[in-house]
Swiss-Prot record:
It comes from Halothermothrix orenii (strain H 168 / OCM 544 / DSM 9562). Belongs to the ATPase delta chain family. This is ATP synthase subunit delta. NCBIfam families: ATP_synt_delta (TIGR01145), PRK05758.2-2 (NF004402), PRK05758.2-4 (NF004403). It is a peripheral membrane protein. F-type ATPases have 2 components, F(1) - the catalytic core - and F(0) - the membrane proton channel. F(1) has five subunits: alpha(3), beta(3), gamma(1), delta(1), epsilon(1). F(0) has three main subunits: a(1), b(2) and c(10-14). The alpha and beta chains form an alternating ring which encloses part of the gamma chain. F(1) is attached to F(0) by a central stalk formed by the gamma and epsilon chains, while a peripheral stalk is formed by the delta and b chains.
């Protein structure tokens, strides 16, 4: 619960700065880069999140890693997070900022899972249909999972649309298993 409160407070403040300075897309891109760096470089995350590493040392690491990669407001924001001892919430803050920024931009991130790779044409058709249905800008991410056999699974936020053959087969199997044996006309061996 405190994660949500802290992340919302800081992400909302940064969002306000981004909107006032007309830098929403830039801030979002920079924060996505920071998030990627934290995931990619475990040592960076360990230093920033460790409670015994002094704030000045953390700020020096931030300077070395990000000073030439992010704008001054985002750089200052990172230092503020360290000054306020909120580094452990950085992932949550970034995630919340990106969600709020996407909402402001009318952007929806959608993940599509298919058994085989979708062609560029199929991706574009799907993207256009989703764009029309949702009346939003779409950012489409595709994944391949041969285990779904065929069809596609679409994940939109918390919603899941499962049009996979595996799901359909599982549904059929479940329906068949619910039918009492006597209704199937199967004669049971009486021993």
């Amino acid at each position: 619960m405190i994660n949500n409160e802290v992340s919302r407070k800081y992400s909302s403040a940064l969002l306000e700065v981004a909107l006032e300075s007309d830098n929403l897309s830039r801030f979002k891109e920079e924060l996505e880069g920071i998030s990627k760096a934290l995931k990619q470089y475990d040592d960076l995350k360990k230093i920033l999140y460790h409670p015994r590493v002094l704030p000045d040392d953390k700020k020096e690491v931030i300077h070395q890693v990000f000073s030439d990669k992010v704008s001054e407001p985002v750089f200052n924001f990172l230092n503020l997070i360290v000054d306020k001892r909120r580094e452990v919430y950085l992932d949550f803050i970034i995630r919340d900022f990106i969600k709020q920024a996407n909402r402001k931009e009318g952007l929806v991130k959608i993940e599509v899972v298919s058994a085989i790779e979708l062609s560029e044409k199929q991706r574009e058709q799907l993207k256009n249909k989703l764009k029309k249905a949702l009346n939003k800008k779409i950012e489409l991410k595709t994944k391949i999972d041969p285990g779904i056999i065929g069809g596609i699974i679409i994940k939109i936020g918390d919603r899941l649309i499962d049009g996979s053959i595996k799901h359909q087969l599982d549904s059929i199997k479940e329906s068949i298993e619910k039918i009492p044996v006597t209704e199937l006309g199967v004669i049971q061996n009486e021993s």
